[in-house]
Amino acid sequence: MQERHTEQDYRALLIADTPIIDVRAPIEFEQGAMPAAINLPLMNNDERAAVGICYKQQGSDAALAQGHKLVAGEIRQQRMDAWRAACLQNPHGILCCARGGQRSHIVQRWLHDAGIDYPLVEGGYKALRQTAIQATIELAQKPIVLIGGCTGSGKTLLVQQQPNGVDLEGLARHRGSAFGRTLQPQLSQASFENLLAAEMLKTDAHQDLRLWVLEDESRMIGSNHLPECLRERMTQATIAVVEDPFEIRLERLNEEYFLRMHHDFTHAYGDEQGWQEYCEYLHHGLSAIKRRLGLQRYNELAARLDAALTTQLTTGSTDGHLAWLVPLLEEYYDPMYRYQLEKKAEKVVFHGEWAEVAEWVKTQ
């Protein structure tokens, strides 16, 4: 039974999106996991905690015996059934625990006894995590071009369309502003970093990559923060700024934040609850910048938002949202971005409309 334990093997697992049957407890998995991993634990959180206490008080042999006692009979059979099904569904997958220790070896042995030979990650999640960290450090050393521009400039789409582009907001499941949340919950910080590393490895492996194309992001994207090694390189990068007409930006924002978000919420929750979730999403976004706007201006814009939602509910038209979106851009988002851009003006090497920037990026 071949085990994979070299640095190149670990990288190959991430590049290939190799299915990983992660047998750690759910609490460990939630703190950090690899992108292609599914959690089928040997022990649940309570069982793991009980074995941990036993280990501290009585030693490893007693802890092992306690684990076998807790995972026995019907519980063991249920978990065996889940592992067997996962192995058959993912014949080219691999087992993983925290450090490639007893848990993955126990599951591997039980599967072997049931007629299934399945490899495991020698070194476990810890080894894969270190590989992800090191890969990000190395790959971040390549030159970077940042795509900048005011809100609604189509920066994310431009990055997505580049073969050497990495969509940081897509990986973070957040669009980086007060209205940036999506219907998918954000990953833990470690899981986000692992996903980013895997994406960079895959992008680099599939071409002769000379430079990265990334969106000009701040350190935080929602609750996730960029790895320091990448953030540091981004502060040194050149910037291409998209300068589209205001009307074009409004069309994009209408599509992305009103039409698409309303569709996504109703698709996920049904018409009635979806509408409520959509309304709360917009109000929450505006409320998040209440202090920046000042109470009086916030109340004015919130009233316009309510009126726009009433119009949208009764007529289906999203045009009413311009009454609060336009001043929000003119008074808050655009001045804020221009101020940030002024501080790094010496790094700006190209200005142009969306298509011009997209064409320029191809020449780099």
Swiss-Prot record:
Tell me which residues make up the Rhodanese domain.
Answer: 14-137
Q: Which reaction does it catalyse?
A: 5-methylaminomethyl-2-thiouridine(34) in tRNA + selenophosphate + (2E)-geranyl diphosphate + H2O + H(+) = 5-methylaminomethyl-2-selenouridine(34) in tRNA + (2E)-thiogeraniol + phosphate + diphosphate; 5-methylaminomethyl-2-thiouridine(34) in tRNA + (2E)-geranyl diphosphate = 5-methylaminomethyl-S-(2E)-geranyl-thiouridine(34) in tRNA + diphosphate; 5-methylaminomethyl-S-(2E)-geranyl-thiouridine(34) in tRNA + selenophosphate + H(+) = 5-methylaminomethyl-2-(Se-phospho)selenouridine(34) in tRNA + (2E)-thiogeraniol; 5-methylaminomethyl-2-(Se-phospho)selenouridine(34) in tRNA + H2O = 5-methylaminomethyl-2-selenouridine(34) in tRNA + phosphate
Provide the coiled-coil residue spans. Answer: none
- Which Gene Ontology molecular-function terms are recorded? transferase activity, transferring alkyl or aryl (other than methyl) groups; tRNA 2-selenouridine synthase activity
Q: Which residues form the signal peptide?
A: none
What Enzyme Commission number(s) does the record list for this chain? Answer: 2.9.1.3
Q: Does the UniProt entry include the keyword Transferase?
A: yes
List the InterPro entries hit by this protein, alphabetically: Rhodanese-like_dom, Rhodanese-like_dom_sf, SelU
Which domain of life does the protein's organism represent? Answer: Bacteria
Keyword vocabulary terms for this entry = Selenium, Transferase
Catalytic-site annotation from UniProt: C97
Which one GO biological process term can you cite for this protein?
A: tRNA wobble uridine modification
| Database matches in Gene3D superfamilies | Rhodanese-like domain
The record ties this protein, via HAMAP family, to: tRNA_sel_U_synth
Q: How does it assemble?
A: Monomer.
What biological function has been recorded for the protein in this entry?
Answer: Involved in the post-transcriptional modification of the uridine at the wobble position (U34) of tRNA(Lys), tRNA(Glu) and tRNA(Gln). Catalyzes the conversion of 2-thiouridine (S2U-RNA) to 2-selenouridine (Se2U-RNA). Acts in a two-step process involving geranylation of 2-thiouridine (S2U) to S-geranyl-2-thiouridine (geS2U) and subsequent selenation of the latter derivative to 2-selenouridine (Se2U) in the tRNA chain.
Q: Which family does it belong to?
A: Belongs to the SelU family.
**Record's protein name:** tRNA 2-selenouridine synthase
